[in-house]
């Protein structure tokens, strides 16, 4: 089994019994009971499982949790949709914009859109068609979602969204070859 350390929604997590091929999606849903991250296609096509990942260099990316293995987040900060709002419950600007612009209908895809938009918001990115190209919606249509992204882009980035990179230095991680029952993973 593999031992890893990471931040989850701003909280340090140490896991010493995760299989090297365990996906972040399954870990979030099955072990942490964070079910906002959805399993849509389980192939990286729909974006319903998008999570925010900050690596030790401070690079922030929106990644598909269904394609991300747990050892790949060793030493990183992960934010699921549950960790996008301020810890006091105040919605993130993209969450407020999605509500006010009616960017959700059935809601299944909404968490992935919100996380992708929050990553773009943190980076100051404004090419929303490109940013959201990895997220699919079958009911709302994309116009209200794009309007929400545009509306949120001028809002200040909430302070808790910048805190993860500073907290990563406190994690103790080891890069190693791990093996478990014919499963191997090397974290480069």
Model segments located where?
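Signature of N-terminal electron-transfer/Fe-S-associated modules in redox systems
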Residues: 1-188
């Amino acid at each position: 089994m593999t031992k890893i350390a990471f931040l989850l929604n701003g909280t340090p997590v140490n896991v010493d019994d995760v299989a090297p091929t365990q996906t972040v999606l399954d870990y979030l849903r099955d072990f942490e009971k964070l079910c906002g991250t959805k399993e849509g296609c389980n192939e990286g096509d729909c974006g319903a499982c998008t999570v925010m990942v900050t690596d030790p260099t401070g690079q922030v990316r929106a990644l598909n949790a269904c394609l991300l293995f747990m050892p790949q987040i060793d030493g990183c900060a992960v934010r699921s949709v549950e960790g996008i709002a301020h810890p006091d419950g105040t919605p993130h600007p993209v969450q407020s914009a999605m509500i006010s612009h009616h960017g959700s209908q059935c809601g299944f895809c909404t968490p992935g859109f919100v996380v992708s938009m929050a990553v773009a918001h943190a980076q100051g990115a404004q090419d929303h068609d490109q940013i959201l190209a990895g997220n699919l919606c079958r009911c709302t249509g994309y116009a209200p979602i794009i309007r929400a992204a545009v509306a949120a882009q001028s809002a200040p980035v909430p302070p808790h969204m910048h805190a993860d990179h500073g907290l990563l230095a406190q994690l103790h991680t080891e890069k190693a070859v791990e093996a478990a029952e014919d499963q191997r993973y090397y974290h480069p």
